Amino acid sequence: MEEQKQSQTGPDNPTTEVQAVADFDYVTVVGCSVPQILDSWSARDIASNVWNGQAGDKVWFINHGIRQLQQYPTGTPDYSIQRVFLIFTEQYPRKLLDEVKSIVEGMYGASYRELTSISGLVDFVQMRLKKQRRIKQMDFYAHGVVHSVEFGYETGNKTQTELRFGLAQARMMNELAFDDEARIFSYACRTGLGFDIGDRLDPGEDPKYSESLAQVLADAADIRVNAFPRRTSYENTFGTSTDRKAALETQRKMEQNKREQEQYLRRLDDYRHRLKAADNARTTSAPDEPPPEPPVKPYSDEDEKLARQMELREIYKQELGVPLDKHGAVRPVSSGKTPEGLPMGLMSFSPTELE
């Protein structure tokens, strides 16, 4: 929707109408993942989930994108608030994409769009002006190298270039497409680093944050950008090792609880039949014992949630070949081990003129 405001600039000046855009987009952008061919740094820092193997690596970004949708405000029927899921389709099988679309639209009421080149992302941002909408938040989930977010990492020289969000694309981000309070978050490796320093920052060495992709993007879009100077780790996408062990143990407890619940229902049914029989006969003594007690769950609701997520991932793994999680990643992206000497976590980059 739009709000029309009138302002009087002076006694001799005509009244003017100023249109204030009040329609906002919250946008998740998901790259394609090719875990079989990782650069040496990513292979070291983004450890594969042992239980899921490389099949799990293939849906890291998708699962985090689904998780991110849940962090946004709920979309409204009049689209004044809209959640958007953009996905680069390179090397994702159609069956997987169709299921992701069903989850995004059906479970989260978000708009689902497929991209085949980086120009599609640039055009999407530019179209916010034509549609009189503004981006309130944008999140990138993809591989990354210094000075670029790689939405098609190691997909082939031509394709990789066409799916690269680099300095040139960052400078194309029209500030008018973003709300004044908008934020961009990059969960790609080293978006906040100014040049490739290898695996450690030497004493006295300048990481040149001011020359990073994050800073260039902040200046172009005139908003704050949050990015990692280090490589990023997706190893807890399916939960920490403790989470996964607990989920397996909870699954065992759930099976036991299911059997106990079935036994309880049989005992309860028998108890009710005996009560009814005694009431009908009037000569038969009613059961003198109290009704059976239902079994108590030996696990928390959170434990059950993690266990059921694991079960659903296994089902998807059998059906699609990958452990898609319609509830999203269990744990957020974190900092990797390198480059050593750089801050852990996300750094905030403000437009230069605001610093």
PLM region descriptions:
Residues M1-S80:
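Boundary/activation segment at the start of structured domains
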Residues N13, N49-N52, N63, N157, ...:
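Detector for Asparagine
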Residues S33-L38, L69-D196, R313-V322, K326-H327, ...:
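Catalytic-core segments of thiol-dependent peptidases
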Residues L38-G53, E150-T159, G194-K208:
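Short, flexible/disordered intra-domain loops and linkers
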Residues G53, D57-W60, R113, F165, ...:
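Extracytoplasmic/periplasmic, Sec-exported soluble proteins
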Residues H64-Q68, Q169, L213, L217:
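A general structural detector for well-ordered alpha-helical segments in enzyme core domains, enriched
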Residues R183-E355:
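Active-site-proximal C-terminal subdomain of hydrolase catalytic domains
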